Amino acid sequence: MSINAEEISTLIKQQIENFDSDIEVSDVGTVIEVGDGIARAHGLDNAMAGELLEFSNGVMGLAQNLEESNVGIVILGPYTEIKEGDEVRRTGRIMQVPVGEELLGRVVNPLGQPIDGKGPIETSKTRPIEAAAPGVMDRKSVDEPLQTGIKAIDALVPIGRGQRELIIGDRQTGKTTVAVDTILNQKDQDMICIYVAIGQKESTVRNTVETFRKHGALENTIVVTAGASDPAPLLYLSPYAGVAMGEEFMYNGKHVLVIYDDLSKQAVAYRELSLLLRRPPGREAFPGDVFYLHSRLLERAAKLSDAKGGGSLTALPFVETQAGDIAAYIPTNVISITDGQIFLQSDLFFSGVRPAINPGLSVSRVGGSAQIKAMKKVAGTLRLDLASFRELEAFSQFGSDLDKSTQAKLNRGQRTVEVLKQGLHKPMVVEKQVAIIYSLTRGFLDDIPVEDIQRFEEELNIWLESNRNELLTSIRETGNLPDESEFNDAIDSFKKTFLPSNN
């Protein structure tokens, strides 16, 4: 067989033309130390802070400490399979989570992976978990109310859309109940809710999700959970994952409520990571940047200007106190970042005042301008009346000789406390709240026995719905009080039909 020189040269030319000279360059390092969810790697000189890194077994890590000779990596998954000498490579990406309407009604972990057994989430959109907060010119004043459905909050410490309101109190004082009831009340309010459960028992989260489902609130809610048994990195990341999911809706002109339950556990997880990364400890062994941990999260809550779509993201962070000490490190940090706080007191809770809100220590710095006019008018003096009642109550224990005006204040105060009590998972629409608080502040309840107040409220609501529904509709649609003489007549008419239990 003769060799054809022409064929050979054609073949060589083809090979040269088809030669692919692409060279893949990847930054690869070596694990030099691993343990307790932290790895140190040598050779990743160009790694960026917060960059995702991939270990040889497919587990991802987050570059946290960029040191002279090595990189401190937080491992986002099981670390027992990673050993010294393993390869770790850069991805060039920062951590992102899936976002979009496909997540509504689902329970996910902080990486955005579904854990509710309902199959994969079909979304192609992602957002970085760390993002800059909206600037001054991108925001506008908080002017729309966020109705929680809880009388004590909507009347005394109103919350506006785009506000950050801290809910603070000891364990077992009803903090999570406030969150759940607020989400239940958003069902028909065109509001998307994100509930971030940080370091809670799986059984508690399951019960909460079941409550949302039972009351029809799950379809507009995303639940992000990092359980008590999850590694510290997931607890640390979960609030950022939740706010990133919320920002997707906010920047599309929608209204979002994000609840962080609770940030004390996130701070403890971050302290654990920081100490393992050998960062110098400060007060209460927290690292120096623990303030920034929470400020960069909560600053992402905003009411956007009309030019940016007019969306809003409202943040309700929770902080757990030890024996009512609100002057501890994390509580004072978060109080200084937020626009007000609602303080839940354990002795009020155990004496049957639920929600156990202490009106003296609770404040809303911007919510007042978002409160509807009708509520502002009827609840204007309520906080002061309640504070003076608490003071008088303490003094009245020492003597029985009280003048008439003091006795009248005590009587009104007892009825105020009774009106502000509310059952579990029973949020109330704002027009019905206005009706009962109007009855209280205008003296209609002064001669009703204290033990009958709650029955009076229930029956008044039913009577108004059946006989004078136009008054409730007027409050709901205009936000203003109806004509006072009409309102007085309606309540008077009902009062004549009401039978106190001592009759």
From Swiss-Prot:
ATP binds at G169, D170, R171, Q172, T173, G174, K175, T176. The record marks S362 as: Required for activity. Belongs to the ATPase alpha/beta chains family. PROSITE patterns: ATPASE_ALPHA_BETA (PS00152). The gene is atpA. F-type ATPases have 2 components, CF(1) - the catalytic core - and CF(0) - the membrane proton channel. CF(1) has five subunits: alpha(3), beta(3), gamma(1), delta(1), epsilon(1). CF(0) has three main subunits: a(1), b(2) and c(9-12). The alpha and beta chains form an alternating ring which encloses part of the gamma chain. CF(1) is attached to CF(0) by a central stalk formed by the gamma and epsilon chains, while a peripheral stalk is formed by the delta and b chains. InterPro entries: ATP_synth_asu-like_sf, ATP_synth_asu_C, ATP_synth_asu_C_sf, ATP_synth_F1_a_nt-bd_dom, ATP_synth_F1_asu, ATPase_a/bsu_AS, ATPase_F1/V1/A1_a/bsu_N, ATPase_F1/V1/A1_a/bsu_N_sf. It comes from Oceanobacillus iheyensis (strain DSM 14371 / CIP 107618 / JCM 11309 / KCTC 3954 / HTE831). The keyword Membrane applies. It comes from the Bacteria. GO terms for cellular component: plasma membrane; proton-transporting ATP synthase complex. This is ATP synthase subunit alpha. Its EC number is 7.1.2.2. The keyword Ion transport applies. Produces ATP from ADP in the presence of a proton gradient across the membrane. The alpha chain is a regulatory subunit. Keywords: ATP synthesis, ATP-binding, Cell membrane, CF(1), Hydrogen ion transport, Ion transport, Membrane, Nucleotide-binding, Translocase, Transport. GO terms for molecular function: ADP binding; ATP binding; proton-transporting ATP synthase activity, rotational mechanism. CDD domains: ATP-synt_F1_alpha_C (cd18113), ATP-synt_F1_alpha_N (cd18116), F1-ATPase_alpha_CD (cd01132). It is found in: Cell membrane. It is an enzyme of class 7 (translocase). Coiled coil: none annotated. It is a peripheral membrane protein. SUPFAM superfamilies: C-terminal domain of alpha and beta subunits of F1 ATP synthase, N-terminal domain of alpha and beta subunits of F1 ATP synthase, P-loop containing nucleoside triphosphate hydrolases.
